[in-house]
Amino acid sequence: MSRKLHEEELTPEGMDAAQNADPAGDPVSENEGALPAAEPQAQILQEEVERLRAERDAALADREAFQDRLARLQAEFDNARKREAKERSEFRDYSVASTAEAFLPVLDNFQLALASTGTAEQLRMGVELIVKQMDEALRSLSIIPIETVGAQFDPRVHEALEMVEREDVPDHQVIEEVRRGYRIRERLMRPALVRIASNSKQTQA
């Protein structure tokens, strides 16, 4: 019996059957069953790769847009700074010119006085005119002299150079202006340098 089986295995038909036989099962069938499960996983990975690429491209585009916007803002800032510097310079020149213009007539009269050959009285009158013009020029710039002689001493606007004993005027009244003081509107430019009275009778009373 075994010899007969052995002989059948040696025939061409038996050899083909032996080659097609699978003692451990059918591997082809098992592989065919695994392929459908692997295909969805590969599809998921492919979609993830595409999503990451899209995010990368979007990030690169955002970075380029940000760099362009930053460059534009920097250019606008530089232009604004240059424009502000130019306007400041023009305003300063205008202010200086406006101030100097008020004193040009005063300078003209000084030059005329130097060239004058008149008498001492005429020269004095010319100087008085120049002083008046100077005062008007200062007032046109809102620069006002501080009141002194006859006013009560005010340490906010007066600086006492000396106290002089006087009984005919109130104590601490300004009796002499040594140097004129000025203010521009309400702001003090410089205090007036003055001499003030010291009335001992009023002090004792």
Curated annotation (Swiss-Prot):
UniProt keyword terms in alphabetical order: Chaperone, Cytoplasm, Stress response
PANTHER family, per database record: GRPE PROTEIN (PTHR21237), GRPE PROTEIN HOMOLOG, MITOCHONDRIAL (PTHR21237:SF23)
Quaternary state and interactors: Homodimer.
Main location: cytoplasm
GO molecular function, one term: protein-folding chaperone binding
SUPFAM superfamilies membership: Coiled-coil domain of nucleotide exchange factor GrpE (SSF58014), Head domain of nucleotide exchange factor GrpE (SSF51064)
Region described as Disordered: spans on this chain: 1-40
InterPro entries: GrpE, GrpE_coiled_coil, GrpE_head
Family per record: Belongs to the GrpE family.
Protein name: Protein GrpE
Organism: Acidobacterium capsulatum (strain ATCC 51196 / DSM 11244 / BCRC 80197 / JCM 7670 / NBRC 15755 / NCIMB 13165 / 161)
Record function comment: Participates actively in the response to hyperosmotic and heat shock by preventing the aggregation of stress-denatured proteins, in association with DnaK and GrpE. It is the nucleotide exchange factor for DnaK and may function as a thermosensor. Unfolded proteins bind initially to DnaJ; upon interaction with the DnaJ-bound protein, DnaK hydrolyzes its bound ATP, resulting in the formation of a stable complex. GrpE releases ADP from DnaK; ATP binding to DnaK triggers the release of the substrate protein, thus completing the reaction cycle.
Cellular component, GO annotation: cytoplasm
Subcellular location(s) per record: Cytoplasm
GO BP of this protein: protein folding
